[in-house]
Curated annotation (Swiss-Prot):
This is Hemagglutinin-esterase. InterPro entries: Capsid_hemagglutn, HEMA, Hemagglutn-estrase_core, Hemagglutn-estrase_hemagglutn. One of its GO terms (molecular function) is sialate 4-O-acetylesterase activity. Structural protein that makes short spikes at the surface of the virus. Contains receptor binding and receptor-destroying activities. Mediates de-O-acetylation of N-acetyl-4-O-acetylneuraminic acid, which is probably the receptor determinant recognized by the virus on the surface of erythrocytes and susceptible cells. This receptor-destroying activity is important for virus release as it probably helps preventing self-aggregation and ensures the efficient spread of the progeny virus from cell to cell. N-glycosylated in the host RER. One of its GO terms (biological process) is fusion of virus membrane with host plasma membrane. Disulfide bonds join 38-59, 107-155, 183-249, 191-222, 280-285, 320-344.
Length: 385
């Protein structure tokens, strides 16, 4: 029987990498949207778990922070807000689709959604790289030494309103300070309009801004800075101060563990982007994707078989997670587990040219088994004299 096992192991391989997101133990957490929002099922006209891309048995395990219609990027920048909060050693992200080219957001009528897609890439790159080093994620408000009675109403559309950052005139009489305390690290936006000249008229009653800028960038260009706790002063050489109001809070440092990201996209009938794959880079991130179009069972954008298969890895532990996929065992594999963590295969097996008939192997196994029985019988006779 051992020969039969070795035959199939070496010639066919029992430990190929699986295209799933999974975990080594029960210390994991998932951040998602409607495709993993079990609470949203109760809001449907017909309570149908086919709406989800995760298995319903995961709904009450306390390891998922998801909200239909939301994303971490959207909650970070806009008034539409969900407080994504969770903790785990192995972090999985399956969200992001709720801000993409389909929404066509831009700050101005003649602005550019492309600038915002670049912002999205930079945001998720910073999020993923930081979460490889921390267990805990949540949102926090940034508090100031005074309230802003006058602020510019910039970057609004019929679907979203920007509230992080907000903008005030640099002629404001008070110095602007903020303090960060309570978290190990903060992700804070620094957004500006790249311009050589700007002039605005502020409505003192409504705070609405009318104006002109000689833009180099046609929209709001953001970078995302990881700041340690401390007191900060904001100053600018421009005409407008960009004031951050929210930050991502990272807490409870851990040994480096790459995050796992599942592509978040629509059916091909809607425009999607490649922001998540662009942001998810080695060594801090593993990217998982389905090879086909997203075609849901509940509707075309919910319940796709390919992505359900990828998320099915959350139902069980694996031995090893790597760039190529997850491994169930730590023995042999045909694909070396590059950039891996966990108990991973120690060597790649040599794939032999196994073209011979397996029947002789089976007969050898039977003969080996009979030989073992005969030896046991002889030992029995010797023992009983």
């Amino acid at each position: 029987m051992l020969i039969i096992f070795l035959f199939f192991n070496f010639c066919y391989g029992f430990n190929e990498p699986l295209n799933v997101v999974s975990h080594l133990n029960h210390d994991w957490f998932l951040f998602g949207d409607s495709r993993s929002d079990c609470n949203h099922i109760n809001n449907l006209k017909i309570k149908n778990y086919g709406y989800l891309d995760i298995h319903p048995s995961l709904c009450n395990n306390g390891k998922i922070s998801s909200s239909a219609g939301d994303s971490i990027f959207k909650s970070y920048h806009f008034t539409r807000f969900y407080n994504y909060t969770g903790e785990g050693d192995q972090i999985i992200f399956y969200e992001g689709v709720n801000f993409n080219p389909h929404h066509r957001f831009k700050c101005f009528f003649n602005g550019s959604n492309d600038v915002w897609i670049f912002n999205k890439v930079r945001f998720y790159r910073a999020l993923y790289s930081n979460m490889a080093l921390f267990r805990y994620l949540t949102f926090v408000d940034i508090l100031y030494n005074f309230s802003f009675s006058i602020k510019a109403n910039i970057c609004n559309s019929n679907i979203l309103s920007l509230n992080n950052p907000i903008f005030i005139s640099t002629n404001y009489s008070k110095d602007v300070y903020f303090t960060l305390s309570g978290c190990s690290l903060y992700l804070v936006p620094l957004c500006l309009f790249k311009s050589n000249f700007s002039q605005y008229y502020y409505n003192m009653d409504t705070g609405f801004a009318y104006g002109y800028s000689n833009f180099v960038s046609s929209d709001l260009d953001c970078t995302y800075i990881s700041l340690k706790p401390g007191s900060y002063k904001i100053f600018s050489t421009g005409f407008v101060l960009s004031i951050p109001t929210k930050a991502l809070c990272f807490n409870k440092s851990k040994q480096f563990v790459p995050v796992q990201v599942v592509d978040s996209r629509w059916n091909n009938l809607r425009a999607s982007d490649t922001s998540l794959s662009d942001a998810c880079q080695l060594p801090y991130c593993y990217f998982r994707n389905s090879s086909g179009n997203y075609v849901g069972k509940y509707d075309i954008n919910h319940g796709d078989n390919g992505f359900t298969s990828i998320l099915s890895g959350l139902l069980y532990n694996v031995s090893c997670i790597s760039y190529y996929g997850s491994f169930l065992y730590d023995n042999f594999t045909s694909i070396w587990p590059r950039f891996s963590f966990g108990n991973c295969p120690t060597s790649a097996y040599i794939k032999l040219n196994c073209f011979y008939d397996p029947l002789p192997i089976i007969l050898q196994g039977i003969l080996l088994f009979l030989a073992l029985l005969f030896i046991v019988f002889l030992l029995f006779l010797v023992y009983h004299g």
